[in-house]
């Protein structure tokens, strides 16, 4: 089982479970989770649901700058790999390990949250996710100000040891990723 970020369909070799939209914590306030969720397009609410005015909020995720779909909402789909139970996201690779039974589910671009300004960067962290390289959006809904922004990730090759292996890594080049299963 895996989440295919940036797409609303599963590859042919996988079984569709549900589709939805990518959401994350509200980066403007402290608290909440740090992971992303694939929220179902048709939510159910418990009969024992809490009500009130104090909640931890989720924000829709949007593609950030540098993307062909800039400011568009990010779709997701939950897929089940037939007869494969182990899933692995490999950063900085476009293929799965050779000769060990791994199957490529999809190739993508490594992305993480953008926080907006320097004050936010010290207080907010999010997950790294592999967004399908053939990105699409959920609808024509756009947002330039609200929501959760994802940007491609690159290595920080500054020459002062921040990222030790430069080369082969390069600054200002988006890192690839592969989602594999076996």
What are these regions (language model features)?
Residues 1-182:
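Composition-driven recognition of glycine/serine/threonine/acidic- and proline-rich low-complexity segments
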């Amino acid at each position: 089982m895996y989440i295919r970020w940036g797409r609303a369909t599963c590859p042919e070799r996988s079984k569709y479970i549900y589709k939805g939209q990518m959401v994350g914590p509200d980066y403007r306030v402290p608290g909440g989770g740090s992971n992303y969720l694939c929220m179902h397009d048709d939510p159910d609410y418990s009969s024992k649901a809490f009500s009130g005015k104090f909640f931890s909020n989720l924000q829709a995720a949007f593609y950030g700058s540098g993307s062909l779909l800039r400011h568009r909402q990010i779709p997701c789909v939950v897929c089940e790999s037939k007869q494969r139970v182990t899933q692995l996201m490999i950063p900085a690779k476009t293929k799965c390990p050779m000769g060990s039974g791994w199957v490529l589910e999809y190739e993508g671009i490594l992305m993480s949250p953008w926080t907006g300004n320097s004050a936010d960067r010290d207080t907010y962290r999010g997950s790294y996710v592999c967004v399908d390289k053939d990105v699409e959006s959920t609808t024509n809904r756009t947002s330039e100000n609200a929501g959760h922004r994802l940007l491609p990730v690159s290595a920080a090759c500054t020459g002062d040891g921040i990222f030790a292996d430069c080369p082969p890594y390069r600054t200002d080049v988006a890192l690839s990723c592969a989602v594999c299963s076996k």
